[in-house]
């Protein structure tokens, strides 16, 4: 974590707490807030283009609706993977052209097809006969992309059970595209983020999409778009990229050689996760909670939870551990306290007994009511998953650290 990120947190905590007085604590001073280092987005983009120079990232908008993040990626040259009309409208509202959008949801309402046709969004994904016939009826000139089944058995949240055409269906779907006199722009797959690196899932997906291309050419179609999907994380990207490059060169040798292959990908978490840090406030502390089993005796209750920015704890059982404690505007890094700090559990703000962020962690110094806990890697599937359960709202404040200047001189933009 850079010094400028830490200073942004410390300065904001000092600011909001300075507005309070004895007996009068402003609600705004207790709201969780983010710090977003947009320079990290630019670094990620550069790393992507170095590892996969011929692959254009189409950012998976579902992972984050943050407008400043999206604008930064647009400036870098990204396209955008949208799965709903609302996501499409978000991208267009930022002045980004429709030609930079791919509509990737394989099963769509008719109204969304009408919107795409009106706006000129041409790349549309499908994975079954019914969807293709719906496209033919409502948007016959669409540039269709056949999504094939591709999954990794180690995935925490596998998508293959929901979307993707099986190999046995390739031939029939390709022939139906030809019969309906439609265009097959290409093929795609999606291997969701996995708990272990299985680059073989991407290689399988590339081989299957190459088979779609081959069958399409046999019936007189001319696909040119290969979409290698998403699922990339900081810990897996380089290994996946190392497997993807030779697989594309092998399976699409003629297309690559003739310069007629357009390659896309749909990274979301890779770009949206690490730039964002979240600070939550400790609103209550309970000690001697020994009657609840083997958990630590101290419970800390925070002003956030699984129905707000920690939904991934509920969806994929992700563990969240604070990177720092801020007390009276002073930062206390937690790297040295993982083994010798105070044992405690962290609980969310709702009345749901499942709203537990971490059942056993160690923090130091001893955390008090009013302290702040800072979590890193909080940009993906956080604000987009917020609910109003128990009446709690999540109008989170974000402090943006702008890219393009030296970190030591970069000024935070407070919005």
Swiss-Prot record:
InterPro entries: Ala_racemase/Decarboxylase_C (IPR009006), De-COase2_C (IPR022643), De-COase2_N (IPR022644), Orn/DAP/Arg_de-COase (IPR000183), Orn_de-COase (IPR002433), PLP-binding_barrel (IPR029066). GO terms for cellular component: cytoplasm. The modification N6-(pyridoxal phosphate)lysine is found at residue 62. One of its GO terms (molecular function) is ornithine decarboxylase activity. Pathway: Alkaloid biosynthesis. Its EC number is 4.1.1.-. The record marks 190 as: Stacks against the aromatic ring of pyridoxal phosphate and stabilizes reaction intermediates. It is an enzyme of class 4 (lyase). Loline alkaloids show broad-spectrum anti-insect activity, and different lolines may have different biological activities. In vitro tests of NFL, NAL, NML, and semisynthetic loline derivatives with long carbon-chain acylations on the 1-amine have shown that many are effective against both fall armyworm larvae and European corn borer larvae, but the effects seem to differ depending on the modifications. N-Formylloline reduces the weight gain of fall armyworms by deterring feeding, and does not significantly affect corn borers. Substrate binds at residues 315-316, 352. Induction: Expression is induced in loline alkaloid-producing cultures as well as in planta. The modification S-nitrosocysteine is found at residue 351. Homodimer. Belongs to the Orn/Lys/Arg decarboxylase class-II family. Amino acid decarboxylase; part of the gene cluster that mediates the biosynthesis of loline alkaloids, potent insecticidal agents composed of a pyrrolizidine ring system and an uncommon ether bridge linking carbons 2 and 7. Lolines are structurally differentiated by the various modifications of the L-amino group and include norloline, loline, N-methylloline, N-acetylloline, N-acetylnorloline, and N-formylloline. This is Amino acid decarboxylase lolD2. The lineage of its organism: Eukaryota, Fungi, Dikarya, Ascomycota, Pezizomycotina.
